[in-house]
């Protein structure tokens, strides 16, 4: 969804710096007007700090890196738990902590975090580490929002339902019966279909724009009714 977000922000006239651990994932964005691309490992604190120092003034920070671990607690080794929280939560902490002073010095800004419908509001089988980490993102979002609201910093998170992304495609392909697996993902959506990444990206645009200027500390569910 980071790809769709970068394109949506650029269409609105933003100067976007898109980052990814895998430079190949950035190739399709390189020629897009308004987007520059940087390879970044958000689990490397030194690399994150160097990136923030080189980024210049920033008005919007979108924390989007994430990983979906599948399994129950008995199928979730400590290393799986730690990796899920490191990528899904700690990376947000490190990048936000490095970027926030620049935003405050610049008079304010907007931080948007990627959460999930699976988290504080809803559970699903075999998603222990993922759901727990995404619930933590919601808590992080609210705590950050209340701490810095007086400094003109707005912080919200988006909680999508099941989105048709390359990541989902990879997970579906790993099932013994990928066709049935896709049907199962569709069937858990009350609307009877998966979301397009571009649909979710429209909510990103709203939440970082002046149209949402009176919103902070909110979890916005764009889930096709999955949380009902």
Label every model-predicted segment.
Residues 116:
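Residue(s) in the substrate-gating loop at a strand-loop-helix junction
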Residues 160-170:
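Short, flexible catalytic-loop segment of classical short-chain dehydrogenase/reductase
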Residues 72-73, 80-85, 185:
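Substrate-binding pocket helix/loop in short-chain dehydrogenase/reductase
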Residues 96, 133, 141:
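Active-site helix of classical SDR
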Residues 93, 193-222, 227:
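C-terminal substrate-recognition "lid" of short-chain dehydrogenase/reductases
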Residues 1-15:
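Canonical Rossmann dinucleotide-binding motif of NAD(H)/NADP(H)-dependent dehydrogenases/reductases
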Residues 101, 146-150, 213:
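Alpha-helical segment proximal to the catalytic Tyr-Lys
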């Amino acid at each position: 969804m980071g790809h769709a977000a970068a394109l949506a922000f650029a269409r609105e006239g933003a100067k976007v710096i898109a980052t990814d651990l895998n430079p190949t994932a950035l190739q399709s964005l390189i020629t897009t007007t308004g987007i520059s691309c940087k390879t970044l490992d958000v689990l490397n604190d030194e690399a994150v700090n160097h990136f923030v120092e080189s980024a210049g003034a920033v008005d919007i920070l979108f924390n989007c890196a994430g990983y979906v671990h599948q399994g129950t607690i008995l199928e979730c080794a400590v290393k799986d738990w730690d990796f899920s929280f490191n990528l899904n939560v700690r990376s947000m902490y490190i990048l936000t902590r490095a970027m926030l002073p620049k935003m405050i010095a610049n008079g304010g800004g907007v931080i948007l975090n990627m959460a999930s419908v699976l988290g504080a509001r809803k559970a699903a089988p075999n998603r222990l580490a993922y759901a727990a980490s995404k619930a933590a993102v919601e808590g992080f979002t609210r705590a950050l929002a209340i701490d810095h609201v007086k400094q003109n910093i707005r912080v919200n998170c988006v909680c999508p339902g099941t989105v048709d992304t390359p990541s989902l495609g990879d997970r579906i392909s790993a099932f013994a019966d990928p066709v049935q697996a896709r049907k199962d993902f569709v069937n858990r959506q009350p609307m009877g279909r998966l979301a397009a990444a571009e649909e979710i990206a429209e909510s990103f645009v709203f939440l970082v724009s002046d149209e949402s200027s009176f919103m902070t500390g909110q979890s916005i569910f764009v889930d096709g009714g999955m949380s009902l």
